[in-house]
Each structure stands twice: as C-alpha cells, then as structure tokens.
Amino acid sequence: MTHPMVLQLRFTRSEFMRALRGISDEDAGKRFLPMNCISWNVGHLAWQEQSYFLYYAQGQMLRPDIQEAFAYGGPASTPSLKEMKSAWKTITAAVDPWLDSLTTAKLQENVISNGKPINYKYGNLLQRVIYHYWYHLGENMAIRQILGHERLPVYVGNIDDKAPYQPEQADNPTMQ
C-alpha cells in the first residue's frame, strides 16, 4: 500500500501540472522580477525531486544539467517549458518506484549524505517537497494572472476524491 504522504505528493504534483495547462512556451518564459519564470519553476521542482529522492535516497543523478541550472539560489533563466516538463516527467518517473517503497519507518530515518547521516529525515524531505510545490504553484498562478490569463484552475481541485485524508494504518506492515 502506498504511504498516505506519497499520495499527497502525487496529488500535489497533479495540481502543479494542472495549473500549467494552456500556457504557451512564450508565456511560461516571461519573467516578472523578482520572481523566476514559470518554466524555471518547473525545472526547479524537478531539481528538488532529483536531489532529495534520487540523489540523497538512492545515490543517483539522472540529469546533471538540471542539478546545475535549477538548484536553490541558481541563476535565473528562461528555459523552454516543453523541455522542463520533459525533464520533470523523466525525473518524477524515476523517483516513483522509490516513493512506492516508502514506509513510516523509512520516513523516520535520517538522510545519508556523503556516507553520513544528516539532520533531515526522509519524511521531512517529503514534506518540504509537497509544500514547495504549493509555494511555486501559487507563484505560477500569480504570474498567469499578471499575464492576463483567464479561466485558471481553482485551488486544490478535486482533493476530496483524488487525495482524501487517509490515516496511517498501525496494523498494516507496509506502513510500519
């Protein structure tokens, strides 16, 4: 059984992508200072998932170009939305099997970096990613409003059907 926190991440990802529907590559590359452009934000979240769930969790670096160009504090740029969505899809698809394997016990483990445990736990990283998506989703929607886009998606979509609250099940060994 997939951990409830992972289900929340998946819903969050789907909402992030839903908020990009109908935007042109040109508009996604427009920057309103001090914000980054929408396409950069997509690359940035691909960077975070790759860093946390591929590199820290599995020792893999699938897209070094994403690591260099979209890290926290990285240089502003206006990449192609199509290219960033492709990178995001590649990275999230590679992350998913690890996410599917998560248990409550694993989420409580300290992250290992350079062979040593650090202060973060995998559960903390998962929460950071979820909240980070919502931050940039809001930023992206603000940019779309500035651009004059209309009929934008409504906040949190169909959460009741797609991501209802699910308690951890103490008697379920996959959650332990």
Predicted regions and their residues:
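Short, contiguous alpha-helical
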Residues: V6-R10, M17, D25-A71, S113-Q176
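Short, charged, low-complexity loops and linkers
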Residues: M1-M5, G74-S77
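Acidic/histidine-rich alpha-helical segments that form the ligand environment
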Residues: G73-S113, K121-Y135, M175-Q176
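Hydrophobic alpha-helical core bundles mediating ligand binding, dimerization, or RNAP-core interactions
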Residues: L9, R13, L20, W88, ...
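Short, flexible helix-adjacent loops and helix caps
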Residues: R21-A28, T104-L107
